[in-house]
Amino acid sequence: MIFKVYYQEDAAQMPVRERTKSLYIEGESEADVRLKLAKQNFNIEYVTAVTGAYLEYEQANSDFKVVNI
């Protein structure tokens, strides 16, 4: 399953909406995705599954790329 992760690049800084970034990653569950990203210095704000029409919409975006970690 593909998940979209909203995050801040530096876990030590307070989250600011304008600096929120996102990435797409494959995983079995939200917990699996968080475990895969645990070694990164990210402040993870939100993880959501991307399926169906939402996935098709995201794939049409030129920024869509599934990250392998």
Swiss-Prot record:
GO MF entries: DNA binding; DNA-directed RNA polymerase activity
Documented EC number(s): 2.7.7.6
Pfam families assigned to the protein according to its UniProt record, in alphabetical order: RpoY
Domain of life: Bacteria
Main enzyme class: transferase
Gene Ontology CC: one annotated term: DNA-directed RNA polymerase complex
Keywords per UniProt: DNA-directed RNA polymerase, Nucleotidyltransferase, Transcription, Transferase
GO terms, biological process: DNA-templated transcription
Gene3D superfamilies listed in its UniProt record: RNAP, epsilon subunit-like
The reaction(s) this protein catalyses: RNA(n) + a ribonucleoside 5'-triphosphate = RNA(n+1) + diphosphate
Stored InterPro entries: RpoY (IPR009907)
Family statement drawn from the similarity comment of this UniProt entry: Belongs to the RNA polymerase subunit epsilon family.
Functional description taken from the UniProt entry: A non-essential component of RNA polymerase (RNAP).
NCBIfam families reported for this sequence: PRK13667.1
Assembly notes: RNAP is composed of a core of 2 alpha, a beta and a beta' subunit. The core is associated with a delta subunit, and at least one of epsilon or omega. When a sigma factor is associated with the core the holoenzyme is formed, which can initiate transcription.
Protein's UniProt name: DNA-directed RNA polymerase subunit epsilon
Species per Swiss-Prot/TrEMBL record: Shouchella clausii (strain KSM-K16)
